[in-house]
Amino acid sequence: MNEIDTNTTETKGTGIGRYFAGKTIPQIIFGSAAWACILGYVLFSIGQILMYVILRVIGGAAGFSSDVWNTALIYLTFFGVWIMFFLNALLKKNRPLLKAYGTGLRGNRIPELLIGILVGFLMNGVLILFAIMHGDIHLYFDRFSIGAFLFLFVSVFIQSAAEEIMCRGFIYHRILRTYRGQYLAAALINGIFFGLIHITNNGATPIAIIDIMICGIEYSALVYYFDSVWMAMGMHAGWNFTQSILAGLPNSGNVFPYSIFRLDAATVSSTTWDSASRARSRQSS
């Protein structure tokens, strides 16, 4: 993987020891991995809240109230996250991060993005198929329109990519910038952070949170081995779209107003439902 050039000065030593050499306490605090996580979450939250208010006003003025719109609204609020992180990257010291979001990384290309989407779809699709064949769940067809399908796919992609911009784009590369070349530290820290931001999910359990942390580390491995944040975006979106829009299964413990298939809850025992919710919360927003 090609590490983003942040024009930082090399010092003697290795790893964390090299980072601390010759730095003041404020430089250490505000250049730390913890600060990257805090700043990332603040930007993430502000962007989502502001966009939610804007979309609520627009939707109310236009009289939007359909199931498709109410489902898309939940995902489209994450477009504000895109805006906040791109504005942050316009600051001179953060401009190298634009490479992680755009085409600056070798693997940030359309083929890698499409591969990620396909892999995410197949991974979740196979698990859902096995659950159906085993009799754990039963799905029934509800409705379909090509317009809703495309609109909601774009909406889900915006949400999934927003989380990847924060975790595998901003935080991952800020940690690499802090601890020069410490890829394992970057993967572990942003993976743990990825799990912690889902701790308020409906029905979240310790096992589910640990599972999400592992998933965050897996996404970091994609960024490392394929030099592609876009592939992680695609895989995340493919999984979430398959789960919540195609199959109508809980995402973050929530079932959305619109989905192509629906879960027949009458055929699912409480034990199976809880197990399925935990298993499928790993990629939830």
Question: What positions do the PLM features span?
Answer:
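Juxtamembrane helix-loop-helix connectors linking adjacent transmembrane helices
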Residues: I16, M51-A72, P96-A162, Y172-T178
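Hydrophobic alpha-helical transmembrane segments
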Residues: I158, T267-S285
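Short, Lys/Arg-rich, polar N-terminal cytosolic tail immediately upstream
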Residues: M1-P26
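Membrane-interface helix caps and helix-loop-helix hairpins in membrane proteins
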Residues: H134-D142, I197-P206
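Membrane-embedded alpha-helical segments of multi-pass membrane proteins
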Residues: Y75-G80, F121, I146-F153, A162, ...
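Small-polar-interrupted transmembrane alpha-helices in polytopic inner-membrane proteins
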Residues: N124-G125, Y183-I199, M213-G216
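Membrane-interface helix/loop boundary segments of multi-pass membrane proteins
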Residues: A162-I189, A221-S228
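Functionally important transmembrane alpha-helices
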Residues: V42, I46-L50, A208-S269
